[in-house]
From Swiss-Prot:
This is Histone H2A.Z-specific chaperone chz1. It is found in: Nucleus. Keywords: Chaperone, Nucleus. It comes from Aspergillus terreus (strain NIH 2624 / FGSC A1156). InterPro entries: Histone_chaperone_domain_CHZ (IPR019098). Forms a heterotrimer with H2A.Z-H2B, stabilizing the association of the histone dimer. Also, with a lower affinity, forms a heterotrimer with H2A-H2B. Residues 1-111 are annotated as: Disordered. One of its GO terms (cellular component) is nucleus. Residues 22-32, 76-89 have a biased composition (Basic and acidic residues). It comes from the Eukaryota.
């Protein structure tokens, strides 16, 4: 009776019916095709070479494109309250939409 507690380890898939269905499914050891791996590596190397060649054609930076003057805010104190008040003054134009009176001529059909 001690044989009932012993596990049977068999590699025969037909002997274990539930294992037979699961043998082909799930995460298994993937087979790798070395020819595909080699070609992918070669493609990556050729792309890297293309990037290196494109960097040699850079033009020098023109001094005309460099901004100088009062546009820099680094090191300056900004009064956000004053800026908010200035923006509120600009929003007054949106209130004009409420005062709009359409013409009654639009009700007539035209030919």
């Amino acid at each position: 009776m001690g044989d009932n507690n012993r596990a049977t380890l068999g590699s025969d898939a037909a002997a274990n019916a539930p294992d037979a269905a699961a043998f082909d499914k799930g995460k298994g050891k993937a087979t790798e095709d070395p020819s595909l791996e080699m070609s992918m590596d070669e493609d990556e190397e050729s792309e890297e070479n293309d990037d290196e060649d494109g960097g040699d054609n850079l033009e020098p930076i023109s001094a005309d494109n460099i901004i100088s003057g009062g546009r820099r805010t680094r090191g300056k104190t900004i009064d956000f309250q004053e800026a908010a008040e200035k923006i509120q003054g600009d929003d007054d134009d949106e209130d004009d939409d409420e005062e709009f009176q359409p013409n009654d001529d639009d009700d007539n059909m035209r030919d």
